[in-house]
Amino acid sequence: MKYCLPSLVLILTLSASVVLRADTDAEVNARKDALELAGAFGNDGFKIRDGHSCGALKAHDHALIAVNLYAGNQYWFSVGTTEPLKKVAVSLYDETGNQMTTENFSEGDKAAAGFAPENSGQYFVSVDSVGDQEGSFCLVYSYK
């Protein structure tokens, strides 16, 4: 009983410090578009990875998302956006900041980059706002 009260206080303190951020409606719509694009790669045997990364981009800004990739696999990083953000670019960097050569796709408010790493490790996906618009984006990725 002596340890019960401090344990309860600790649990309440920790649970109060955890802040969960729900996706906005714009991010949900962007994720829908990203999943639609990623689904097209499913025709080539790619599986959509659980999880997603959403956020907001200002004009001429970028977001970096860290991912762990494995040599021997192939990946597609698919991004959907919402108005007024109409055009994004997707690029990939290794852990030292070198830009990787990717196969690129862009159509309207969707973009994707395909990549097959030679080395396993941490990479960074850059989602770049191209133009003067800002808005929400969502990234999902597929692998095989």
Which residues does each PLM region occupy?
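Bacterial N-terminal signal peptides
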Residues: 7-16
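Acidic, Ser/Thr/Pro-rich low-complexity intrinsically disordered segments
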Residues: 23-25, 29, 52-136, 142-144
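Glycine-rich phosphate-binding "P-loop"
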Residues: 41-57
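Positively charged n-region of N-terminal signal peptides that target proteins for export
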Residues: 1-7
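N-terminal targeting/docking segments
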Residues: 2, 18-22
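Generic detection of intrinsically disordered/low-complexity segments and helix-coil linkers/edges
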Residues: 8, 35, 40, 48, ...
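Predominantly extracellular/luminal regions of secreted and cell-surface proteins
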Residues: 22-46
